[in-house]
């Protein structure tokens, strides 16, 4: 996995009180929407009246709070220094549906992965459509609350946020710059197929075993497509609703047409999110003479 961006960035701190938006430098805002329910977002309060660039961060997958209490202090799903960012940007964060701003999160002692009980609202609502529509509404609202430079409205999407950011570019004319990190070029389903083919090529499994696995994957994909709005059925830790919505997106189709500057970061050694899709996107844009996308591969 992309080492530079750890899932949790541990902040050694003396804070013993419960974290809240104010103590971390944010102003909370709740948007009430008939379709999406409550959209909870936060914008930095530092120099809110000063004209400067705006940065909307779109985090990765999972029902995790933005800030997470741990034994050694607290962690965050934010992969950059907030204090530094707030000097130059109006920073904007969005909670996923039903997920609190901060809460205690356990970590599996063997794998180190976070363990957190999924809120019911998250289960019922989380989809690509929810995240993209919520982000679009937040951008429209926050640009009325802070003095944002309309020529410098950026998004930073990581992992699942890569997909969200890509889809947002197809909808919102407010975004002027984008950084998209560790995401897919094709549908997310294709990564599972690529992974098995690569394991066969590398000799980890036989080609026959790979084909059996891939045939099983196609069976699952058909089941998801047959019940695309189900929040009762799960696969790989996510509802069918979540999978069907995100798998419907093929980022290369959008990114190969965008005109704004986009900086793509690809993790070349990531086995879960294949770099091949972004390699294809890079080739496609270069053949088309597109110059707005920069491609940055990292181990």
Question: Where in this protein do the model-derived segments appear?
Answer:
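N-terminal cap/lid segment of alpha/beta-hydrolase-fold proteins
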Residues: 18-50
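Primarily recognizes the serine-hydrolase "nucleophile elbow" in alpha/beta-hydrolase
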Residues: 141-145, 150-198
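Short, surface-exposed "cap/lid" segments of acyl-processing enzymes
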Residues: 48-88, 100, 104
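Accessory cap/linker subdomain of secreted extracellular hydrolases
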Residues: 113, 125, 179-257
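Alpha/beta-hydrolase active-site loop
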Residues: 105-145
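Catalytic histidine neighborhood in serine/cysteine hydrolases
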Residues: 286-299
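Short beta-strand/loop motif that positions the catalytic acidic residue
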Residues: 258, 264-266
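Conserved alpha/beta-hydrolase "acid-adjacent" motif
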Residues: 271-280
């Amino acid at each position: 996995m992309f080492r530079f961006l750890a899932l949790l960035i541990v902040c050694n701190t003396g804070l013993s009180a419960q974290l809240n938006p104010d103590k971390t430098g944010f102003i909370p805002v709740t948007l009430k929407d008939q379709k999406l329910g409550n959209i909870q977002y936060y914008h930095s309060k530092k120099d809110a009246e000063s004209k400067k660039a705006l940065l909307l961060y779109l985090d990765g997958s999972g029902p995790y709070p933005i800030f997470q209490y741990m034994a050694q202090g607290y962690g965050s799903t934010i992969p950059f220094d907030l204090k530094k960012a707030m000097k130059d940007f109006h920073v904007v964060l969005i909670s996923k549906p039903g997920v609190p701003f901060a809460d205690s999160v356990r970590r599996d002692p063997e794998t180190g992965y976070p363990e957190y009980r999924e809120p019911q609202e998250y289960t019922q609502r989380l989809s690509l459509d929810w995240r993209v529509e919520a982000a679009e509404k937040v951008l429209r609202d926050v640009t009325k609350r802070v003095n944002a430079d309309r020529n410098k409205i950026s998004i930073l999407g990581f992992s699942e946020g890569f997909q969200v950011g890509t889809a947002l570019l197809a909808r919102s004319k407010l975004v002027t710059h984008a950084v998209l990190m560790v995401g897919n070029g094709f549908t997310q389903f294709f990564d599972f197929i690529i992974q098995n083919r690569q394991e066969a090529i590398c000799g980890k499994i036989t080609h026959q075993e790979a084909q059996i696995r891939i045939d099983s994957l196609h069976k699952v994909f058909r089941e998801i497509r047959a019940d695309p709005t189900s929040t009762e059925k799960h696969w790989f830790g996510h509802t069918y609703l979540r999978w069907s919505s995100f798998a419907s997106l093929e980022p290369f189709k959008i990114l190969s047409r965008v005109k704004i500057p986009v900086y793509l970061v690809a993790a070349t050694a990531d086995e879960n999110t294949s770099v091949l899709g972004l390699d294809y996107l890079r080739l496609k844009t270069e053949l088309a003479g597109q110059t707005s996308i920069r491609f940055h591969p990292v181990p």
